[in-house]
Amino acid sequence: MGSFNTSFEDGFILVGFSDWPQLEPILFVFIFIFYSLTLFGNTIIIALSWLDLRLHTPMYFFLSHLSLLDLCFTTSTVPQLLINLCGVDRTITRGGCVAQLFIYLALGSTECVLLVVMAFDRYAAVCRPLHYMAIMHPHLCQTLAIASWGAGFVNSLIQTGLAMAMPLCGHRLNHFFCEMPVFLKLACADTEGTEAKMFVARVIVVAVPAALILGSYVHIAHAVLRVKSTAGRRKAFGTCGSHLLVVFLFYGSAIYTYLQSIHNYSEREGKFVALFYTIITPILNPLIYTLRNKDVKGALWKVLWRGRDSG
């Protein structure tokens, strides 16, 4: 059997949710609605971050990057999934599969790193308020954003390269998109060495950022407890709790998928877990981080009234 870059010229078959045909129409409706709302919500955040000068702050700078990531991240898999659920075409070309694997891993890895940067930004705002603007100056913000994107794409390049070097036995991918654990399941040769290399990269990109975020929020919680106002503490803990919910869903599902042994990985369960970080998290991010925020609501009304007056 040849290696991935010479095998299966006709591509792969994505099994998707065809094992549950009665579930496919329901999934199609819900996923289509969630995808539409994700596009709408994240596009609004990006537009407002550019249009309203009051949102030209470090926090909204990173949030606009997160929204762009979520737009691209969900678009790298969901359109293919919707086609799959319709049963029109369950195939994907070899080149398309490689491109999807690379883009998906790059964007997912970038989001893992960017969420750490955003946690650091919140830590600086809450725990070092007097020095916040000095710490989070524009040059540092741009550097951190570029570093996040760079780290994500480097990680994806490494893991995609390792995947392409594996010989595969079969062309049926028991998933709704080209995901790494499914390729490892198809590998003909012993993948222990490849798995070890991938595991190190995943610990750096997934586990370490998750630990850093939790550490940041421990410091934030400690600072909030010193706030004398009960209402202020309640508001701060409510915000932190919402942020941690997104972190838990995103990193929890990613850890389940990427940090367990391939021998313990269940393809049937993996498909449903993947829905959390491909469908659920991208729609929660704009709702939790920004659309409930008074500044964002004010900016949105300002833009809407400006458009109404000009009309």
Curated annotation (Swiss-Prot):
GO biological-process terms attached to the record: detection of chemical stimulus involved in sensory perception of smell
Single GO MF descriptor: G protein-coupled receptor activity
Cellular component aspect of the GO annotation: plasma membrane
Gene3D superfamilies registered for this protein in UniProt: Rhodopsin 7-helix transmembrane proteins
Membrane topology according to the record: Multi-pass membrane protein
Extracellular side: 1-25, 80-100, 159-194, 259-271
Residues that span the membrane, as ranges: 26-49, 58-79, 101-120, 140-158, 195-218, 236-258, 272-291
One Pfam short name: 7tm_4
Family statement: Belongs to the G-protein coupled receptor 1 family.
Protein name as annotated: Olfactory receptor 2Y1
Organism field: Homo sapiens (Human)
